[in-house]
Amino acid sequence: MASLRDIRATFLDYFAKHEHEVVPSAPLVPQDDPTLLFVNAGMVPFKNSFTGQEKRASLRATSSQKCVRAGGKHNDLDNVGYTARHHTFFEMLGNFSFGDYFKEEAISHAWNLVTGEFGLPAEKLLVTVYAEDEQARALWRKIAGLTDDRIIGISTSDNFWSMGDTGPCGPCSEIFFDHGPSIAGGPPGSPDEDGDRFIEIWNLVFMQYEQLGPDERINLPKPSIDTGMGLERISAILQGKHNNYETDLFRNLIAAGESVLGVKAEGDALASHRVIADHLRSTCFLMADGVTPSNEGRGYVLRRIMRRAMRHAHLLGAGEPVMWKLVDALKSEMGDAYPELERAQALLEETLQVEEERFQRTLGRGLSLLEEATADMGEGDALAGATAFKLYDTYGFPLDLTQDALRAKGMTVDEAGFNSAMDKQRADARASKFSSGDAAPDAVWFAVRDKVGATAFTGYAGTGGKGRLTAIVSGGQEAKALGSGQRAELVFDETPFYGESGGQCGDTGEIRFVDGAVFTVEDTQKRGGDMHAHIGVLTKGEITLGDVAALDADAPRRAAIRANHSATHLAHAALRDVLGAHVTQKGSHVGPDRLRFDFSHNKSVSADQIAAIEAQVNAVIRQNVPVSTREMTPDAAIEAGALALFGEKYGDTVRVLAMGQGLADHATPYSVELCGGTHVERTGDIALFKIIAETAVSSGIRRIEAMTGEGARLYMDEQIGFGRAAADALKTPPSDLATRVAALVDERRKLERQLAEAKKQLAMGGGASGAPAGPETINGVNFIGRVVEGVGGKDLRGLIDEAKAQMGSGVAAFIGVNDGKAALAVGVTDDLKDRFVAVDLVKAGAAAVGGKGGGGRPDFAQAGGPDGAKANDGLAAIRAALAG
């Protein structure tokens, strides 16, 4: 029996033998495609090649592409665990032709592979074609010898693929496997086609047209091929299984889950084990590709998947985090094909453990709320959308988790109501976004790129150089000339100006043309992937395409940027050494004045840890050793120990930057990373490194801000000055400042406690002796009511408790007045709760001070109002309500 990894290798090897470039899987986060949440098909990384926006060296490719379908249009999440073939994560095997071979060779390859390499019986296979595609029908007869009854014409869009309303499109042909009459279901196109007897295993897309509009379609000059075969699906067939979860990979993952949870995958537990195994894959691969759990966008989808798996672990009796314990099993199954699992293992385990601990803290409360909300509901009823949204917003329950919990009760959720509440929150929180309207659309830059090609970057050698003007984009359109005072983006055949990328900001400077024209560069950005657009204004003269100029980036500014960029590499290495190998870069910004570095870590970095990080970085700076740069393939670089950004897509060659000597092993570089930015020549050029801030960015993401060189020195001088000024004010030596401040803080706390006690005695009616004044009687019950100046709402609870204890039986009301506002609290002893409700009494008082409502329990309630001057009126209103 062939294993899943063997089947993957057989597919790729077959096409490699037929002159296809084996392309590694792209990251799950699409590169430069905001229309997609995740890569959900094998062709997605090749989209620009099919549209002609990107030229490939090879016209043939094959890949096993990681895919996720768990959000948006393609959302399989609800079905996962309960069906035979739904997954959130899957691998798509595919072969692609970019204007090279077409239908005949594609069909020939497909038939040879499934019947020859995979050994599937021809009599078990049938195909579909688009009803109007007679060419494909004839080719299947010719190549496979299929009879007409096994070539089914489909006239719907199921067999005609398009990229969108416009663009490349064409008919499809699908290969189906027949499981035999023992399985219910009919062939494709029949009324019972949704049964499980006939399973699609491969889809061949023949891109032969370009859709120009609703009714306008033309032939492509160079037709292309895009095919997709689900690895899990074909593995099940080749292993003689009817359910993907019975294949070797899933059996091994489920066995690991059984071992960790101590529960067999059978009966009611089977679906939960399958959910955990599937979601483990999508969770780990998403994080390995740079996605972090959050409450929005891709991070929210990741958290939804995580929490669904964690809830199923809870159903199986997990009393502590368990998902992180399964990462090693996943690495054993898939780490050879996807080495990012091993590189990210520490991050995956730590994040899963922290997320599950966080979820377990809220799970009980959320499930209790769900039980209360459904207590009076019956089978077939729908939970209110507002309640489902409260579960999401307050307890972190994604909608599908709530739906999953209700499934066993035969209940549903009012999704429209949930979406309405979600939309309202987003509308309330969304900040206004503005755009200048001057930016050129991508189509303009792709057109420019086709004409002029990439910009050669010469800035590694220095900040000056010469270049020929190849493009002018002004007002969002291409131009041939530019006059004085006009703003534009200029492109040259080569430039020393660095275009913003990799977190490093773009260069500024000046461009002087040979005829005397001067262009001031305010920023440099990358357009169309690899063109450097110099953004600014022509301050003198006129220019036209083809003009030659001297380009000079601001050298002092670049030097500061170089120091800060190199410092981010050293800081990254130090963070990993001090905090742990789970630390990975999650973003950065390198400017001339400071650097910002975001990284994965689940708690704040302590002062001692910050000091240790600074000490390591400054030790490497003092080594003053040369920084080395080499170019190599990404695989070779990673094999050599270089750190790569999770989820980043690299080209055929990468720059590998090595800095410093290992603090324990001088033969090993302190930092080795892939980077295309500009850097110092020696570590000593950084001069000094100082962290000035450490904050949280989001759940599991921390940020440090730091300065280097002269900026760091000035910052430290300023901080020392603040310390000296504070020491002078306290009349103490700087060395004793911390001790003196701590003593003052303790003294203040003591005085605050004494003041609070004095206020409490005063509020209870006591004089200097502290003896409290007795209660009055209203409507036959004891009542203590006071207005207390300078007391906030949080301090009233203690006064209420003391008054109730003093009376034994009675009602207490206190109104604190602070900063002109009133805070009210009312307490009722237990024996009187049937006669008086604290909430009703506090509402009466709140109305008198301009407040609305009030909340709490029958025995204790609080409220507030804006008019503290009417506090006595509020107390009178409570007395009146008590009197009835």
Swiss-Prot record:
InterPro entries referenced in this protein's UniProt entry, alphabetically: aa-tRNA-synth_II/BPL/LPL, Ala-tRNA-lgiase_IIc, Ala-tRNA-ligase_IIc_anticod-bd, Ala-tRNA-synth_IIc_core, Ala-tRNA-synth_IIc_N, Ala-tRNA_ligase, Ala_tRNA_ligase_euk/bac, DHHA1_dom
Q: Signal peptide span per the entry? A: none
GO biological process terms, semicolon-separated: alanyl-tRNA aminoacylation; negative regulation of DNA-templated transcription
Gene3D superfamilies named among the record's database cross-references: 2.40.30.130, 3.10.310.40, 3.30.54.20, 6.10.250.550, Bira Bifunctional Protein, Domain 2, Threonyl-trna Synthetase, Chain A, domain 2
Q: Which cofactor does it need?
A: Zn(2+)
Q: Where in the cell is it found?
A: Cytoplasm
The UniProt keyword set, sorted, is: Aminoacyl-tRNA synthetase, ATP-binding, Cytoplasm, Ligase, Metal-binding, Nucleotide-binding, Protein biosynthesis, RNA-binding, tRNA-binding, Zinc
Q: What is its EC number?
A: 6.1.1.7
List of residues binding Zn(2+) = H565, H569, C675, H679
Q: Write down the PROSITE patterns for this protein, in alphabetical order.
A: AA_TRNA_LIGASE_II_ALA (PS50860)
Q: Name one GO cellular component term.
A: cytosol
Task: Cite the GO molecular-function annotations of the record.
Answer: alanine-tRNA ligase activity; aminoacyl-tRNA deacylase activity; ATP binding; tRNA binding; zinc ion binding
* Disulfide links within the chain: none
The UniProt note on the cofactor reads as follows: Binds 1 zinc ion per subunit.
Which reaction does this enzyme catalyse, per its entry? tRNA(Ala) + L-alanine + ATP = L-alanyl-tRNA(Ala) + AMP + diphosphate
Q: What class of enzyme is it?
A: ligase
Its domain comment says:
Consists of three domains; the N-terminal catalytic domain, the editing domain and the C-terminal C-Ala domain. The editing domain removes incorrectly charged amino acids, while the C-Ala domain, along with tRNA(Ala), serves as a bridge to cooperatively bring together the editing and aminoacylation centers thus stimulating deacylation of misacylated tRNAs.
Q: What family does the database annotate?
A: Belongs to the class-II aminoacyl-tRNA synthetase family.
The task this protein performs is described as:
Catalyzes the attachment of alanine to tRNA(Ala) in a two-step reaction: alanine is first activated by ATP to form Ala-AMP and then transferred to the acceptor end of tRNA(Ala). Also edits incorrectly charged Ser-tRNA(Ala) and Gly-tRNA(Ala) via its editing domain.
HAMAP family, sorted? Ala_tRNA_synth_B
Full protein name = Alanine--tRNA ligase
